[in-house]
Amino acid sequence: MAKLPASNSLEVLVEKAILTCSLNGVLTNPKQHPVPVTPEQVAASARDAFNAGASIMHIHFRMQEEDLGHLPSWEPQVAADLEAAIRDACPGVIINQTTGVVGPDVSGPIACMRRIKPEIAACNAGTLNYLKLKKDGSWAWPPMVFDNPVEKVAEMLAVMKETHARPEFECFDVGIVRSVGLYQDNGMCTKAQYNFVMGVASGMPADTELLPLLLKYMKPGAFWQTTLIGQKEIWPVHQKTAELGGMLRTGVEDTFYLPSGERTTGNGQLIETLAQYARNAGRAVASPAEARQML
């Protein structure tokens, strides 16, 4: 189990699993997949996930113009409209905002953080060659560098501190996990909260055998969760995460598939399945109020 300061109330709470729903992601085409885009769609999908046990909603902002919903938006008003819709639909919910951008210009995510003041903000903690192949061996998209140098991370962390957002460090490989510890030792952040992103083709695979190694190299006692990208092969890693005391995340940003290999109908069905995995590990699902206390 994740370690917390000793107290009777926390010893009870730490047994519980906090569930995060990754509502929509950054580029998936809503015409092809059940990805919510508009405030109404996002609210309905968040409500389904909330009712199934999700206390945290991880949100990407999409362009609202017709036929452009597959593209990201950093308009603060779009962010505010989506945030308000989620909070209205899910009383007490915790918002986790994306901040990921390619290149040095972070003005968009910063403007959105300052506008909506999320409780948690994702902080991409290191650089990755972001690659994927088609079945014929050609690139699925032009090879790109998801660049997150230290100065970019520091700029994000400064605004998270200003807006009282808790940083969630996105870690795509073991070196990035170790970098997060260096950020804390350097004083760039006070508490490390890890999100092990597994299943990106050029990052860590979704493999249960990696989890003990990742836990070995993170800061002792830190909160951690896994983000698992893929199809039915990710679900054993969800189960192992639950058994090892990690917090759990799923949603149509990460997968469209249930453990059976069937396609999901949406976020509610995925979170319902994830909640059962927590219970299989002997852990109850944390309520939003309990999640706030644990965090």
Per-range role (PLM):
Residues 7-34, 127-139:
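N-terminal small/glycine-rich loop or linker at the start of catalytic domains
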Residues 21, 68-97, 153-160, 213-221, ...:
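Alpha-helix-loop-beta-strand connector modules within alpha/beta enzyme cores
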Residues 42, 49, 60, 121, ...:
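Conserved, mostly hydrophobic/aromatic
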Residues 55-80, 198, 256-260:
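Glycine-rich, proline-tolerant flexible connector loops at the mouths of alpha/beta enzymes
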Residues 56, 169-170, 281-290:
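Flexible, glycine/charged-enriched surface loops at secondary-structure junctions
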Residues 73-147:
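Active-site beta->alpha loop and helix N-cap motifs at the rims of alpha/beta catalytic domains
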Residues 120-253, 264:
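Catalytic alpha/beta core domains of metabolic enzymes, predominantly
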Residues 133-140, 144, 260-283:
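C-terminal helical cap(s) of enzyme catalytic domains, especially alpha/beta-barrels
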